[in-house]
Amino acid sequence: MGSRLKQNPDTTFEVYIEVNRPGSTDEDPELQRIFPEDFSDQEVLQTVTKFCFPFSLDSLTSSHVGQNFTFVLTDIDSKQRFGFCRLSSGAKSCFCILSYLPWFEAFYKLLNILAEYSSKNQDSQRNELLKTLHGHPIPEPGTPMHLSVHSHFTVPDSQELPSIPENRNLTEYFVAVDVNNMLHLYASMLYERRILICCSKLSTLTACIHGSSAMLFPMYWQHVYIPVLPPHLLDYCCAPMPYLIGIHSSLMEKVKGMSLDDVVFLNVDTNTLETPFDDLQNLPNEVVSALKNRIRKMSTTTGDGVARAFLKAQASLFGSYRNALKIEPEEPITFCEETFVSHRSSGLRPFLQNAIQLQLFKQFIDGRLDLLNSGNGFSDVFEEEINMGEYAGSDKLYHQWLSTVKKGSGAFINTMKTRANPAMKTVYKFAKDHAKMGIKEVKNRLKQKDMAENGFSTATEEPLPQISPSSIEKKRGEERRPITVHFGQVRPPRPHVPRRPKSNAVVESRTTAGSSPDQPQQYRTLKESDADGDEAISPEKDSSEATVKEPQSTEVKHVSLLEDIFSNLQTEPPLLSQAKSLEDLRTPKEDHENQFTFDYQRMDLTAQERTRTIPAMKHGHPYNKLWSMGHDDMAIPNKYLQISPERHLTLPSNSTVTPHKDSALTNIEKEVTIASSQGNITIPRPHGRKTPELGIVPPPPAPRGIKLQTAMTDANKQQTGDSSNYHGQITEGSLRELSADNGEKETAGSSTSEILKPVKVSTEVGMNDDDLLSLLDPLKAGRYQTASQPPMGTLPHSFETPCCSSTPLLTSLQSDFVSPAFSHQLGFAPQPAFLHSPLNPFAQALAAEKTASVMGPPMGVFKAPVATALGSHSFLPTPGIYHSPRPLTSALQGSNLFGQISSGTPLNPVIRQSHSLSETQSNMPLMTSIPAGHRTLPMVQSRSKHQDGKPREYPPIPPRPAKLLEPALLPTKSDQPIDPFEDLLNKTKQTVTPASGKVEHLRKQWETFE
């Protein structure tokens, strides 16, 4: 294989000698001792003695040349013999062992022991050790060898890669020379240049020579190889052939005087390299860069990493030699140089074209061919690296030989036919294994990529497609996208906090009928729901195809809660910033295995409302506000709110329709419904009852602006003229003015700095009689609106008032006591019943029969109840305010509460509505109609003059004792409306001038109320 090591030497060493340093350069070294004593090769003895002192004896630094070094002698067969030397202190003498075995560490250790014996004149121990070593059979590589108590070592293996720090030569070479110089030296050796290395220490010098040449494995330097050059052989530096020579720095002055042309010179002491060639640049760039990176990574680690980095470079350059092997029947295996060069890439061909002319490569190929043709075969780390790397290519012929060829007496035993089948099997298995590993790696990478992007594996669950509506679908005005529920994984129950109401779509599914926040039901994925083979209908598909695949049902139709409301409807999915969950971003599919029943309510507005644009409107429609608010739980059906009682939704429609009893029951039993109309309220039925109760709907409050009243009065007159068509309609003027009015309230109430401002107290004499009373009356709560609510036109929730103020003058006084911003900051936690202090100066202090416990967010708005006897649950229209259930009081069994008409007396709902409207149209805007089946609380016109001023927010009023409401709970006459506050107003008819101290005292009580 081109190795210059002698195989199977006769003894472990040839000769051991001790040499004394000569007194001058003209004298020869004096031989002191020799073992074995019968060694007769005088020529070798003369040469060895001259190599024992390879430096200038006249140099002042000759005593500091180091201790251990190795020289090499070449025999007649071009085999190397290593001379392991150890210089004594001051370099006065040298101990040398000449051997064919490259056991550097073992012989250095033995030399130290022998030097100690000589210094102590222990000749018997020295001779015994040398005799044992010389007569010991050569052990196998890797086996321990015991010579004496103090001399034992492990036999090194020349076929293994050298490691750091076990290999002394590689360790010193790697420490002394930097990476770039190592690469340049490696490239120069591949191009077989004339290389000179100099150093002031003999140990480092010879280590660099041996270490650099070892990096050529599995190739060997085939030219002049002199690790350390003695003074009498300096003329070798002018040799025309390639060489690798080490010279002590004391001899460099003589070498520089010679004509050295095309010599690569490396000075280890200064770590500088001089070369007239571009050998490193001529190597393939990918090989050099990979080698450099590997060496730098291994610079701080131990082991064979550095040697393996060079081995990989050798494999990448020469590993494809297998493809150039030619196997002919009954002929020796040969190597085709043209095939070796032509099958590689164009960037590598120039180097390979030069490599086939190199002596080291030719010796390498000849050694491989000798082993192949002899039938012995081979297996070393280089071949293993080729098999592991990507350098082998299609080495079919080589595998064919490895599996089948056997040669004896110079002839093949088997024919090529018998060798072909097992060879092909080997190649097939090799390729199959590599293919499987490659496919598995690709799958794993794709799986990891999908899991990193989507959060789940595609092998177990298919991701829900996100389909954006196309332009074709937007043009289909009659097609309706089906309302589907969110299918996905079960989410943990959320904390019981106040939430906004659900949308107005009541969706019921058999698969999710029992879901609740505390016990969520596992939603089936679309992949499971489509197990029957039905594919989900994409919104992009044709409507005819969608109709065929849709389950036939008379109750289920394509329902759209968002279309057919306004012309400026936004049907695009909510923005990413509005989504609180990944489920909001998915486009749900239809489940064809289960049929869903959709029950919906919608607002049918007039044609004017369809075409107009509501001011200060963020969303195109109130429903869009609901669908994009962010709580993804609202999209899950049958998920009950913890803060909202069960109530039936009653919305006005264009035609006067009597509520159907069955449909009302169905809606109540199936799902929670939230009121979305403006101006009506429905009393929830008590648990266990099957018929919904009729509610009492007080009219909305009146604005207090003169300019606003003019437009509102005109609008109301227009509606009064046609009371039959009024049901379910909202006048454009009132809606615009109300939205503007509410916009002003939002602006006024949004500033939090007003909380710290001093409260304005009016102390004018001649104040209206009803001012202070309206402040203290819990029924004068006025309109409720938080800073977070949208304008009137875009309210997604019901906007109702339990009662309304009779005059705008009362409102102006009420807002003087408490600032608008301060009213938003009051939130009342549930508290037990307590006695109220008499806030009304004209009424006696009464014990509170039942105080309404208010629950809401800290920034919520307090709302007073209409009455304590309206039902088993008292609730308020704004979400987040919940009144605890209270038993029916005796007032229900009294005198026809709120003028309730007996069941036996029929009453035309249209007449009743028009009657109520005629009485109250002059001082209040009617936002929505009062549907049939509900009773209205009529209001008397104010006898006071209207006061100019901006509408203000009402101060929060705590629950009042129920007895204060009794004057209003009087029977009403069918022909004339009765003011429920008439008695109380008559009682307080006298003019009251509040004192400044009294008002200040009341204001402090309101501010400190908990």
Curated annotation (Swiss-Prot):
Top-rank lineage group of the source organism: Eukaryota
Chain positions covered by the region annotation Disordered: 455-554
MF annotations from Gene Ontology: guanyl-nucleotide exchange factor activity; phosphatidylinositol phosphate binding; phosphatidylinositol-3-phosphate binding
Subcellular location field: Cytoplasmic vesicle, Clathrin-coated vesicle membrane; Presynaptic cell membrane
Annotated Basic residues bias: 493-502
Compositionally skewed regions (Basic and acidic residues) per UniProt: 472-482, 538-548
Domain dDENN: 298-375
Residues of the uDENN domain: 13-143
Signal peptide segment: none
Membrane topology: Peripheral membrane protein
Protein name: DENN domain-containing protein 1A
Organism: Xenopus laevis (African clawed frog)
